[in-house]
Amino acid sequence: MLLTCTNSLKISSQAKEWESKTLTGMSLEQLNKRIRIPASDIEGTMTSRVKEMLSKVELSVSSYDTAWVAMVPTLDSSKQPLFPKSLKWIMENQQPDGSWGLDLSHPLLIKDSLSSTLACVLALQKWNVGQQLVHKGLDFVQSNIWAATDEHQRSPIGFDMIFPSMIEYGRDMGLNLSLNQSLVEAMLLKRDLETKRLFYYLKDKPSNLAYVAEGLNTLNDWKEVMKFQRSNGSLFNSPSSTAAALIHLHDGKCFEYLNSLTKKFGNAVPTIYPFDIYARLFVIDSLEKLGIDRYVREDKEKMLDDIYRCWMQGSEEIFSDPTCCAMAFRILRTNGYAISSDALANFDEKESLFYEKDAKSTLELFKASQTTIFQDEPVLDKINAWTSTYLEKELRDGTIPDKSLHAEVDYALKHIQANLVRLEHRSYIENYNVDNVSLLKASYRFCNVDNRDLLTFSFQDYNMCQSMHRKELDYLEGWIKKCGIDQLEYARQTIKYAAFSIASSIFQPKFSDGRISWAQNSVLTTIVDDFFDYGGSMEELVNLIELVQRWDDHTTIGYKSKEVEILFNAVYSTTNDLADKARILQGRCVKKHMIDSWIFLLKAMLKEAEWARNKIVPTMDDFIPNGYISFALGPIILTSLYLVEPLSEEAVNSEEYEKLYMVISILGRLINDRVATQSDGAQGKLNIVTLEVINGKGAITEEEVQEKVARTIDSNRRELLRMVSQTEGSIVPKACKDFFWTMSNVLHLFYMGDDGYSSPTKMMSAVNAVINEPIVLP
């Protein structure tokens, strides 16, 4: 049933361990021996490097923030710098072209270089030192001032307010700034208009303005700014903001904060501190998006436990920053930690961001809004509304200059419900930003996070897993011929889609048996569904059910047709093979469970066939309990779970297990029936939409039913994600629960036309991306 709406559809692996010979006719046991993953560097040196990245993340220094620290005078005199070693660092770190900054070669970071360079020039001019350096710095600013108004340049937070103000500071100091006067006036006008606008719109959120206080030339009450001083003495963990406050107020706690930074980092300071939580979230998020986090599972879990403790303690580092808060919320919730979305209430409006055009923060908030697990989470609903609108506009207008971020936003918006992680991994790998440069008020990077290593690691791992998927598909194509189901006239060629549907999310090598089971039963249930719809007579349908009920004693019954014989033997031999394999993993025989799932399915399909052929209109109370079983996810999902991880009888008989199956089955039935209303009607089949209209007797229209079904789909999807994510009180293994969530994403992919794969061409491209085409990096 899973594949009923799909359209009909050479690998040259670089790994020498893989052969390209066909596996047609091989047994499942032989296949598993052939595709065993060899020990390699993937589990050796690279894993050690990733663990090192997780254990300690180092941040680059910021010329911009160091310059502001260098401008702070001693507390008893305005003629001497309080941090002379920071001033010395500036004098020793000018680049040959006269600039200061992190990434001088990046063509889109010229605004950042302008800001850092002018700040350093101001520091030198203030203390009347390094005049030659000042002249070289001014030459750089004058030569590159065009970038200050270039909308295609990546802009540091608050640049349009801070940079013009620094020009004014420079003039007041007597700097000879030979800049285009009309351009400077335009920047000053834009700053003033932006300041007025923000004062008006952010009167209830003054912290956003205080973050860029060094750029507010009209700010008279610095004591108001100090309301946002944190327990560590800083303003927003920003050395530049804290230094600006210390210049005006001589606050002791500000001094202690900056003094500790210069001691810790050796005279030059980073653009944000502390940054431990965000840095670790950044690395975890990168590993997840690259598909390699499984190699450091224990380290990741330990780190998430630490982050969760910080969350529960109300860490300022988390809750004061939208990017950090959104990322922490999403990663913690999807990894099973019980946290409330109310923590994101401060970011439920666009104006809550420090910087209006902060696409990175907006994307993180949008992703967080996708993790709704309760029926009433208004904060996430509000965040989803404004972030999706904003990001869609940014894409249309082409105003996201960072190529990697642009690709990530584009993927996130196009695959809201059909987010198949392997496609996300591939997109992220192919668009990965190896420069590892991010922007706050200045650019920064994590010095010991080697993005090139991560990229190499991830693309090798992707291609290795893909090689296994290709071998699995070879085996499945041989199985089709061996079973003879390719001889059935009405049997659609769905094996590629079946293999893709599971490999696109459950890709890990150790789950190969589970993937093969999923694909085999997806094909079998689709063919059986067609047989019950129009391929077989009632006598043949009853015959097939009796054969399955007898199982090993089926020879006493006989076959009513060749089609029945082929179908039964395919179900019989495949289920027996899978049960033998499952027995090894489970330590007990689970064949009866597998057979029962087929019996329940066939009886439900027979009931629907009787309704259709006898033109009976059932009540909704009769249709739904039967309809969720007839959607055929029992053999597909439940059988596969026995080949994933040990699954106790307690878990199989639990309310949690039954509810997972029921919720995903109802979800599938709703998604299918919402889309297939017209096609089902043409075939004389009833579904939830048409039944609701018929039983409503004119009181409800089809459009109203469609809207009702859409709301129910959303409700069930939230409930499913809650059950899959929760860990407290759960006895079903997480790896098994992931199969239910994978099915939800696959159903949206196959049945919904608004997630990017509605055309055969796009679907084929997705199949090839996961199974056939290795990643080739430039």
Curated annotation (Swiss-Prot):
Query: Which keywords describe this protein according to UniProt?
Result: Chloroplast, Lyase, Magnesium, Metal-binding, Plastid, Transit peptide
Q: Where is the transit peptide?
A: 1-37
Q: Name one GO molecular function term.
A: terpene synthase activity
Record-level GO BP terms: gibberellin biosynthetic process
The entry marks the following residues as binding Mg(2+) 3, namely: 672-673, 680
Compartment(s) of residence: Plastid, Chloroplast
Q: How is the cofactor bound?
A: Binds 3 Mg(2+) ions per subunit.
Stored Gene3D superfamilies: 1.50.10.160, Farnesyl Diphosphate Synthase, Terpene synthase, N-terminal domain
Question: Motif location (DDXXD motif)?
Answer: 529-533
Question: Does the keyword field hold Phosphoprotein?
Answer: no
The entry marks the following residues as binding Mg(2+) 2, namely 529, 533
- What is one GO cellular-component annotation here? chloroplast
A Pfam cross-reference name: Terpene_synth
EC class? lyase
Q: List residues binding Mg(2+) 1.
A: 529, 533
Q: Coiled-coil segments, which residues?
A: none
Its required cofactor(s), as named, are: Mg(2+)
Q: Which reaction is catalysed here?
A: ent-copalyl diphosphate = ent-trachylobane + diphosphate; ent-copalyl diphosphate = ent-kaur-16-ene + diphosphate
- Please describe what this protein does: Diterpene cyclase involved in the biosynthesis of labdane-related diterpenoids (LRDs) natural products. Catalyzes the cyclization of ent-CDP into ent-trachylobane as a major and ent-kaurene as a minor product.
Domain description from the entry?
The Asp-Asp-Xaa-Xaa-Asp/Glu (DDXXD/E) motif is important for the catalytic activity, presumably through binding to Mg(2+).
The UniProt similarity line reads:
Belongs to the terpene synthase family.
Q: What is this protein called?
A: Ent-trachylobane synthase KSL2, chloroplastic
> What's the encoding gene here?
KSL2
